[in-house]
Amino acid sequence: MLGLQIFTLLSIPTLLYTYEIEPLERTSTPPEKEFGYWCTYANHCRFCWDCQDGICRNKAFKNHSPILENDYIANCSIYRRNDFCIYHITSIKPHKTYRTECPQHINHERHEADIRKWQKLLTYGFYLAGCILAVNYIRKRSLQTVMYLLVFLVISFLLSQLMLYGELEDKKHKIGSIPPKRELEHWCTHGKYCNFCWDCQNGICKNKAFKNHPPIGENDFIRYDCWTTHLPNKCSYEKIYKHFDTHIMECSQPTHFKWYDNLMKKQDIM
């Protein structure tokens, strides 16, 4: 009974941390409170912009400089399930579909602060459980029982720490400021405002990854130095502008870029 109580105590922070996100039915306009999320990935979607007299201002990021209205701003529809989010670009035929992982879109600094908070709670829980074990030993003098429970407590504590700190280890793998040329199409689908996606000359910027992308005027939209991280099971890019902000997605995304998956498989074989 005592072991069950200790396990419950240690599990509460982890259970709270792994909450599910409410589903969202298909719509062309996300809830206002979610603009920051959708307009980070789908920042060329029309619902992110307020355009008047040819000048467009970003609804989600008020400090974003205005840009001229052009073909970069497209009509989109979105929907969400518990484990993934999808947005469709409907103003282009054939329609293009992109998938992102909803629970992992989170400000890196805030994410790390949350992990530190739960780590402290787990530590306090560990101390409390140790006190309970000590009291139990003093009362019943059952050293063997206390040792079994102590081992169980330590294992549970370490497993909880591994679960919480897993994502903080990402920076130790394959980090670079400029991705390989063969991967530009992949990275520039998500991090399209990263400066490695654009070739700017005389105030006009052309997209390096998508040759059919119309040129746009150089502006603050293209101002981020980005760092990319490529892991075996997921990729992330980090914006370096005032505050670090990390976004994570599966390396195989977007799913319609089959050439990227095939290229990676060929490299593994070689």
From Swiss-Prot:
Record-level GO cellular component terms: membrane
Domain of life: Viruses
Record's bilayer topology term: Multi-pass membrane protein
Glycosylated residues in this chain: N75
Spans within the Extracellular topological domain: 27-117, 167-270
A repeat placement: 27-146
Signal peptide segment: 1-26
Transmembrane annotation, as ranges: 118-138, 146-166
Membrane side Cytoplasmic: residue ranges: 139-145
Tagged with keyword Transmembrane helix: yes
Subcellular location: Membrane
B repeat start and end residues: 147-270
Principal cellular location given in the protein's record: membrane
Disulfide bonds: none
Entry keyword set: Early protein, Glycoprotein, Membrane, Repeat, Signal, Transmembrane, Transmembrane helix
Record function comment: Plays a role in virus cell tropism, and may be required for efficient virus replication in macrophages.
Homology family: Belongs to the asfivirus MGF 110 family.
Entry protein name: Protein MGF 110-1L
Source organism of this protein record: African swine fever virus (isolate Pig/Portugal/OURT88/1988) (ASFV)
Phylogenetic classification of the source organism: Viruses, Varidnaviria, Bamfordvirae, Nucleocytoviricota, Pokkesviricetes
